Structure formats: C-alpha cells, structure tokens
A protein has these predicted regions:
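Alpha-helical scaffold domains
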Residues: 1-169
C-alpha cells in the first residue's frame, strides 16, 4: 500500500471507491503469480477498486476476451490510468482488436476514443500490418483528435501518427 500515491491520485481527481496506490510493477507480479482466469478477472472488475480493475485486465486470458466485453469495460472506465493498462495489456491483444479500436476512435466519448488510439498504438508497436485504407482512416481520425480539445486523445493520436510515420517513412 502506498498512501502517498493514493493521496496524490485522489488530489488529482482520481477517486476510486478504494485506491491502495499499488504500482503497476507490483500488480504485474501478483498477476503472474495468480495466472490467467476469466472468472477471477470478471469478479475483480466488478469492484470499483483501482488495483482490482488493473489486476482484472492483467489476468483475463486475451484469447477469451472479446470486443463486446471490451465495450462494456470501457463504459466503466473513468480514469486514464485504467484506460492505459487495459489498452496495453488486454484490448490490444484480444481478437479483432484493430476493428474494435477503429470503432472506438470514432466515438463521441473521450475515454472510448483514448482507448481506441492507445490500442492502435500498441498494435502498431507489435508490428501489426494495416492496409492503406486503414492507414488513411487512422491518419484522418488522429489529425482530428490532435486538433481537438481533449489532451489525452491528442497525445495518444500523436503516438499513433508517430508510429505510422516511422513505419511508412
């Protein structure tokens, strides 16, 4: 438990029902010791406790997690830290991740868009190939997000564009 970290998050407006301030490296270690389990992940997700939700994303078997479930989880994500963990460790590794991410970046909801851009950025880091039509669509959506008012979406969109530029010279 890290009271300083949880207090800092609370002061920044990140208010889970409970927040112990446990760091991601420690949670990853706990998840690796626990192993993958969809039942455990679902039970953990139901708690509005930061560490439980992060652990849920880390222990859910990626091959069993589907975009419909991701849509439900995204509706319940309120803070960027959880969006980042879910996008990196679960959403980008699920079946049909790219299709879901394209849908998310077109959403009116800022957290949903943020998850979409983060998921695409992680897919591109994983050397995932995208056809020219998809590349242009991502560029158009990313440029719109960068010129928008949502700083988090703009940063995630910039990461996607940077990755596309690096890969496509």
């Amino acid at each position: 438990m890290n009271g300083v970290a949880s207090t800092g998050m609370r002061e920044a407006g990140i208010e889970y029902k409970l927040n112990f301030g446990v760091g991601i490296p420690q949670l990853k270690e706990i998840a690796s010791e626990t192993g993958k389990s969809s039942e455990l992940a679902v039970a953990l997700w139901k708690e509005d406790i930061r560490e439980c939700r992060i652990l849920a994303a880390l222990v859910y078997p990626e091959d069993q997690f589907l975009p419909d479930m991701a849509d439900l989880w995204i509706e319940q994500i309120r803070y960027p830290d959880l969006a980042e963990v879910c996008s990196m460790y679960l959403f980008s590794r699920m079946k049909n991740a790219a299709e879901a991410a394209f849908r998310w970046i077109a959403s009116d909801n800022a957290i949903t868009r943020y998850c979409g851009f983060l998921t695409l950025a992680h897919l591109l880091r994983g050397e995932r190939e995208m056809g020219p039509r998809y590349v242009q669509e991502v560029k158009d959506q990313a440029e719109a997000a960068i010129s928008g008012k949502d700083i988090l979406c703009a940063q995630a969109a910039k990461a996607v564009l940077d990755r596309l530029d690096r890969d496509n010279g």
